């Protein structure tokens, strides 16, 4: 019987899983932001129709796009998300103790909740704005 599979979100702690997300990444060779280097910096590739080079840190959820071939992924990550705890980890993920891993994952979960809460707040504010405009038009 084989080892049980890791939960999908925990798989992203492993660099090879992050590399696998860079299927149609535009920068493959002779550049600083190859899939391997992007994955080392904690990024996964999550392209959209309008942003084919969109990458997101799986840990702090910072999204960056508009990559240039000479962009250094770790430097860009530090510049745009200096508080990301993933960047401070000095060990390979496989070398972390269970306690270290769970502490790290607790921070990732907090980041995810903060991101989702922020997105919901923006969505609510946009709905409130639209509703307010509709009410004002009725009153006019």
Curated annotation (Swiss-Prot):
Q: Where are the BIR repeats?
A: 18-88
Annotated region described as Disordered, given as residue ranges: 113-140
Q: Where does Zn(2+) 2 bind?
A: 76, 80
Q: Which residues carry this modification: N6-acetyllysine?
A: 23, 90, 110, 112, 115, 129
Please state where this protein is localized: Cytoplasm; Nucleus; Chromosome; Chromosome, Centromere
Q: Where is this site: Interaction with FBXL7?
A: 126
Q: What is its main location?
A: cytoplasm
Posttranslational mods: Ubiquitinated by the Cul9-RING ubiquitin-protein ligase complex, leading to its degradation. Ubiquitination is required for centrosomal targeting. Deubiquitinated by USP35 or USP38; leading to stabilization. Acetylation at Lys-129 results in its homodimerization, while deacetylation promotes the formation of monomers which heterodimerize with XPO1/CRM1 which facilitates its nuclear export. The acetylated form represses STAT3 transactivation. The dynamic equilibrium between its acetylation and deacetylation at Lys-129 determines its interaction with XPO1/CRM1, its subsequent subcellular localization, and its ability to inhibit STAT3 transactivation.
Task: Please list the residues that carry the modification Phosphothreonine.
Answer: 34, 48, 117
Q: Which GO terms describe its cellular component?
A: centriole; chromosome passenger complex; chromosome, centromeric region; cytoplasm; cytoplasmic microtubule; cytosol; interphase microtubule organizing center; kinetochore
Question: Which terms in the Gene Ontology molecular function aspect does this entry carry?
Answer: cysteine-type endopeptidase inhibitor activity; cysteine-type endopeptidase inhibitor activity involved in apoptotic process; microtubule binding; protein homodimerization activity; tubulin binding; zinc ion binding
Could you confirm whether the keyword Repressor appears in this record? yes
Listed Pfam families? BIR (PF00653)
Biased amino acid composition, Polar residues: 130-140
Extract the PANTHER family matched here: BACULOVIRAL IAP REPEAT-CONTAINING PROTEIN 5, DETERIN
Q: What is known of its domains?
A: The BIR repeat is necessary and sufficient for LAMTOR5 binding.
Q: What does this protein do?
A: Multitasking protein that has dual roles in promoting cell proliferation and preventing apoptosis. Component of a chromosome passage protein complex (CPC) which is essential for chromosome alignment and segregation during mitosis and cytokinesis. Acts as an important regulator of the localization of this complex; directs CPC movement to different locations from the inner centromere during prometaphase to midbody during cytokinesis and participates in the organization of the center spindle by associating with polymerized microtubules.
Give the record's subunit note. Monomer or homodimer. Exists as a homodimer in the apo state and as a monomer in the CPC-bound state. The monomer protects cells against apoptosis more efficiently than the dimer. Only the dimeric form is capable of enhancing tubulin stability in cells. When phosphorylated, interacts with LAMTOR5/HBXIP; the resulting complex binds pro-CASP9, as well as active CASP9, but much less efficiently.
Q: How is this protein named in the record? A: Baculoviral IAP repeat-containing protein 5
Gene assigned in the entry: Birc5
